[in-house]
């Protein structure tokens, strides 16, 4: 193995000076990098009329306060929430006292809702999926993914409402795929720009489909292709659109070659 160079790049917004340290390990660079520092500075400079925002990560995640989602919010407030979501990629609202119907009402302000074909829903609110996790329940969500990329038109966003959470653990993690794209070496970025990924429901949900119904379900939800690098429709930023759960392979390559 080679040596690892841990590098902290000069970041005026954080008051850091350049420092280098070599330790035995993998040949990678770690630490604040210029494209993250620039985006973080931009996000910290944003201001909002209908709520306050507190950044939670360097370039992803913000807590929005001073807004009641159970109310019928005016359209300018909804547009500003959408703009905040576009900017921070994920937003959090604490201590919201909402019913299931209010949850759905808020979600409908942002577009058409869908019913998940594999997760169980309820008759009263079929657009809602209830997740229950505990010592007696298993799961397979502990892999990075974007929801329902196996659809021809994947969901734009997901709205989670926590009803009961543990004191420790149970975390949901989020990654900034714009920052991931910006941080690619130039040769990998050029290669990724020309690739298309094949997405399939079968990698995650195939075992839930009875064998006698598999062909029927495949006809309803056939494999779809999406670019590995996409452009956000409102911000214009480029981002990586691949994940280990739903991407079966890269077009023109075998699954083994795609890893």
Question: Language-model segments: what does each one mean?
Answer:
Residues 2-259:
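Non-heme Fe(II) oxygenase catalytic core, chiefly the N-lobe of the double-stranded beta-helix
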């Amino acid at each position: 193995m080679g040596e690892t160079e841990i590098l902290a790049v000069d970041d005026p917004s954080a008051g850091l000076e350049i420092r280098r340290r070599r330790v035995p390990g993998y040949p990678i660079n770690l630490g604040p990098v210029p494209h993250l520092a620039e985006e973080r500075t931009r996000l910290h400079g944003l201001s909002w009329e209908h709520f306050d925002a507190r950044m939670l990560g360097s370039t992803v995640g913000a807590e929005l306060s001073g807004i009641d989602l159970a109310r019928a919010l005016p359209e300018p407030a909804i547009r500003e929430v959408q703009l905040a979501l576009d900017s921070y990629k994920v937003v959090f609202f604490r201590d919201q006292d909402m019913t299931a119907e209010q949850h759905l009402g808020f979600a409908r302000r942002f577009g058409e809702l869908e019913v998940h074909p594999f997760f169980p829903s309820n008759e009263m609110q079929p657009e809602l999926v209830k997740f229950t996790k505990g010592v007696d329940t298993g799961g397979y969500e502990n892999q990075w993914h974007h929801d329902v990329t196996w659809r021809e038109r994947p969901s734009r966003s997901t709205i989670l409402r926590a009803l009961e959470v543990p004191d420790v653990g149970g975390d949901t993690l989020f990654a900034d795929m714009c920052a991931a794209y910006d941080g690619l070496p130039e040769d990998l970025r050029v290669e990724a720009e020309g690739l298309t990924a094949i997405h399939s429901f079968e990698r995650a949900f195939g075992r839930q489909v009875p064998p006698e119904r598999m062909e029927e379900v495949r006809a309803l939800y056939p494999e779809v292709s999406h670019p590995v690098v996409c452009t956000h429709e409102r911000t214009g930023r480029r981002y990586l659109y691949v994940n280990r759960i739903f991407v079966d392979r890269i077009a023109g390559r075998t699954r083994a070659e795609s890893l």
